[in-house]
A protein has these predicted regions:
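Short flexible loop/turn segments that cap and initiate beta-strands
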Residues: 9-12, 64-87, 114, 167-196
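Interdomain boundary/hinge segments at the C-termini of tandem beta-sandwich modules
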Residues: 32-38, 135-140, 244-250
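Enriched for extracellular/lumenal, surface-exposed ectodomains of secreted and cell-surface proteins
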Residues: 4, 8-28, 66, 83, ...
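Beta-strand-rich structural segments
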Residues: 1, 16, 53-70, 101, ...
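Aromatic sugar-binding surface patches on proteins
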Residues: 1, 95-102, 201-213
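Surface-exposed loops/turns
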Residues: 6-8, 53-54, 75, 95, ...
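Proline-enriched interdomain boundary motifs that mark the N-terminal boundary
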Residues: 37-47, 140-148, 251-259
Length: 261
């Protein structure tokens, strides 16, 4: 049938037109048929790429139309949404054919680009339809913790610093496929990145990290604030930082004034 054909029970009539041929007389034959409407999804949102943190809500919408009948909106039909193949809800289409759903991203949701499936199972006179989109990027906060520093280094000496960085569900930093994400912790002392050198700082399985910091020979004695920071190189983690304090010692010398040596 052509676009614009109304779905439902129809009568198909085949007719040989009278006097259309000198060899045949006119006749006709009728047969009952049922025309199913063809459906599709339009106006899917979000259309453009968005980033959503775990624990936050994301709004999704689509419009169910009858493509075989001039794309008329279909109201009152159930549409199911699936997040990475897992159903998250079934909602009816409104008067304009839109199916709107709000989904709270669980903290167990895998990170990265997520495929969302939109499904209409069909009805007694409408064929089913499905569509999918991959415009939602799931992201996690990170929490960085520094262990207490008990060392009291002298200028020119080395001390150790350690801690842990985790995602918002307590796991270490992982790739989308669940493998370890290569990452480093960066440091500054008293707001400066000079006066010391760092070795290590690699994030390991479970988010644990440690580093050795070598102070320069002229590093001043006193109380210091050290900051550890994670700056992500991927778009499915947010960065984080933390600070703690430690004391350093300097050198002293005694000069003889009297008697002169």
């Amino acid at each position: 049938s052509n676009n614009g054909t109304v779905r439902g029970a129809k009568t198909l009539v085949i007719t040989v037109i009278e006097e259309s041929s000198i060899y045949y007389t006119g006749s006709s034959k009728e047969s009952s048929i049922f025309v199913f409407g063809v459906t599709q999804f339009d106006s899917i949102q979000p259309l453009n790429a968005i980033v959503v943190n775990r624990g936050a809500d994301v709004n999704m919408t689509s419009q169910l139309v009858e493509s075989s009948n001039l794309f008329q909106p279909l109201s009152g039909y159930d549409v199911t949404y699936q997040f990475r193949g897992i159903p998250i809800g079934t909602v009816p289409t409104d008067g304009r054919g839109f199916a709107n759903i709000t989904h709270n991203i669980p903290f167990s949701q895998p990170l990265g680009i997520t495929t969302v499936d939109v499904i209409f199972a069909g009805s007694s006179d409408l064929l089913g339809a499905s569509a999918n989109f991959s415009t939602i990027n799931i992201r996690s906060l990170t929490i960085l913790v520094i262990d207490d520093i008990f060392d009291n280094p002298v200028a020119g000496e080395q001390f150790n610093i350690s801690g842990r960085i985790t995602s918002d569900n307590g796991s270490g930093l992982e790739q989308v496929d669940g493998t370890l994400l290569p990452a480093n912790i960066l440091f500054d002392i008293n707001g400066e990145s000079i006066g010391f050198t760092v070795s290590g700082g690699f994030v390991t399985t479970g988010g644990y990290w440690n580093a050795s910091i070598l102070l320069s020979p002229n590093f001043a004695a006193g109380n210091n604030t050290i900051e550890a920071a994670y700056i992500p190189a991927v778009n499915f983690y947010l960065g984080s930082n933390s600070t703690t304090q430690f004391d350093t010692r300097g050198f002293t010398e005694i000069r003889f004034i009297e008697p002169t040596l």
